[in-house]
Amino acid sequence: MSRYRGPRLRVTRRLGELPGLTRKASKKSNPPGQHGQARRKRSEYAIRLEEKQKLRFNYGVSERQLVRYVKKARAQEGSTGTNLLRLLENRLDNVCFRLGFGGTIPGSRQLVNHGHVTINGKVLDIAGYQCKPGDVISIKENKASKKLVEGNIEFPGLANVPPHIELDKPKLTGKINGKCDREWVALEINELLVVEYYSRKV
């Protein structure tokens, strides 16, 4: 399953607020469809599927990518759910979003893909790069790159930069100083349900 490129508000009407996907809020409260979804008790599978979809759409990863992240999270010590969230939070496109370089994760991904972002002084156009402690993320030293970011950083998608990331706003630079704490994940998600969803699939 490839990355979603359709209407974003349609997704948030179905799944709720996804801060990484869009800053806009739908004026319609009912789920998408001619008459919305019928009111009936959802199965446990449907609930787990919805949580998985929240994670996919918020961070903008494909099903195949998410499966890889789940496998990697399982192989690490500690809680698989927390490990999974940290892997997604450490993606370069998400770190740029948390720094305020892009208004959304898709916007930040575009900055990375188009070569406007450097890691430790070198241009890196891989949005899924896993940022690690000590990495310095900067906007490339040219007018075009800086102009793209300056408007976003004054009105970031999320108000607060997580404490594990250090932002030097005038220099348009950030530094990773540690791991992301669970409480600083902006998405309202039950990651344990995502792990359960994949328990028989991965």
Swiss-Prot record:
The S4 RNA-binding domain covers 90-152
One GO molecular-function annotation for this sequence? rRNA binding
Protein origin, superkingdom: Bacteria
Assembly, in brief, is: Part of the 30S ribosomal subunit. Contacts protein S5. The interaction surface between S4 and S5 is involved in control of translational fidelity.
- Basic residues: which segments have biased composition? 1-13
* An annotated GO cellular component: small ribosomal subunit
In this UniProt entry, which cysteines form S-S bonds? none
The annotated region (Disordered) lies at 1-42
Family per record: Belongs to the universal ribosomal protein uS4 family.
Reported function: One of the primary rRNA binding proteins, it binds directly to 16S rRNA where it nucleates assembly of the body of the 30S subunit.
Q: List the keywords (alphabetical).
A: Ribonucleoprotein, Ribosomal protein, RNA-binding, rRNA-binding
Per its record, how is this protein called by name? Answer: Small ribosomal subunit protein uS4
Q: Identify the species of origin.
A: Prochlorococcus marinus subsp. pastoris (strain CCMP1986 / NIES-2087 / MED4)
* Biological processes per GO annotation: ribosomal small subunit biogenesis; translation
